[in-house]
Amino acid sequence: MKALEVLFWISLFIVFYTYIGYGILLYILVKIKECFRKPAPRPMPADDALPPLTLFIAAYNEEDVVDEKMHNCLELDYPADKLRILWVTDGSNDHTNERLSHWPQAIVLHQPQRQGKTAALNRGIHFVETPLVVFTDANTHLNREALREIVHAFTDPKVGCVAGEKRIAVQSKDNAASGGEGLYWKYESTLKALDARLYSAVGAAGELFAVRRELFEEMQTDTLLDDFILSLRIVMQGHTIAYCANAYAVESGSADMREEEKRKVRIAAGGLQSIWRLRPLLNPFRYGTFCFQYISHRVLRWSLTHILLFLLLPLNTILIFTTSTPLLYAIIWLLQALFYLMGSWGYYLSMKHIKNKILFIPYYFLFMNVNVIRGFNYLHKRKGNASGAWEKARRA
């Protein structure tokens, strides 16, 4: 049974490292680095030094939020003569284009065929003439200083992409979907900030990120995580991804856990797809520190850890009856059983619309990992589908 014991402890270590250990190690490495070399402060560019930029919004049937989004765009603290607002509304068959026609500041590209968001990005980028392009979603609200903060990050010539912060608007009445997603993004934002301080953030969220126009590489139209693929291909070109917490996008959480499940399964499938398409980044001799960050922060989560997580309990059960130290394994088994029990209780309460943050954590954690497994099936079903179109989750 030595082999099973070794497998158990390796699995336990990988699960711990993926979700907790990497964050701890990352924090230590950042502190060590900054003891020897602190980043030099860069001044905020004056108005006359601000570059022209394009705010790029790929939208499909967003009639309900068009006016609110345009109001938000025009309220941003950036010179109007240096800001272009580009909408790509391919496939939209509601009143999105009609509403946009009332806004002379909006440049609208539309074709009747819906080919997915990635195809819309590939098409729209040819109409971008500014050195910087900021991508954002139609249903998100940007803070007033977002564009200036993003431009500030680009004053470092090594930075090829800037990731803004994603925030979930959570109200007391919200369900487990909003509460769980909000907690997840707070943790994820902390990791991104530490990643960027060590070397580079590992990806950007599509709600708000920006790239240098010259570094944009067209993607396969069946790409599921366009924001992730696009940002990491910029790293492959020798640039870094800066993280800017002072530029943030706020959106509502998913309407319910069924809608959140759609998102998580698609993201998991997109993660698996991304690992294959970004496989050169797995070369530590070429990408060094970033390879370590990429594997620790993303690859393990999407490829291996969820399998090992659910393998731990049956392995643990076997080891209780087959090793010379059954008490140790019995204690670990009880801790696992308690965690699963709390997750199940959290699920029950969410069905009753009763909010309990303590129980939402194990529930949402297990929910995410179950949907990573479902991502394999989602990706298999899409095999041969050249379109990146997907059913978007309803927001609260």
Regions found by a protein language model. Name each.
Residues 54, 72, 86-97, 113, ...:
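A conserved acidic beta->alpha catalytic loop
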Residues 51-54, 84, 229:
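Cell-envelope/extracellular polymer assembly enzymes that use nucleotide-activated donors
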Residues 133:
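Short aromatic/hydrophobic "clamp" motif used to bind/position activated sugar donors
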